[in-house]
Amino acid sequence: MSDKKLYVVAVELENRKEQAISVQEVLTKYGDCILTRQGVHDPGSDRGIITLNVNADNVYLEEFSEELSRIPGVKVRTIKF
């Protein structure tokens, strides 16, 4: 069994209106590892950022991040603690 670690995952959406449904589907799929979620949008633009606190092993986090990154216009950055 792999050890779970705490991560902060930042998800940037270039056009949140177009990408929200696809991103939400991935977040729901991996919801068992998401501890907290905060979303903010850039006033005056369609950009948005979602910040997640995640408790997962490295393999699961990689799968999660890669699936989000495959959505056109979505960027993912991760910090491990």
Feature locations, PLM:
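Long, contiguous binding/interaction regions
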Residues: 1-81
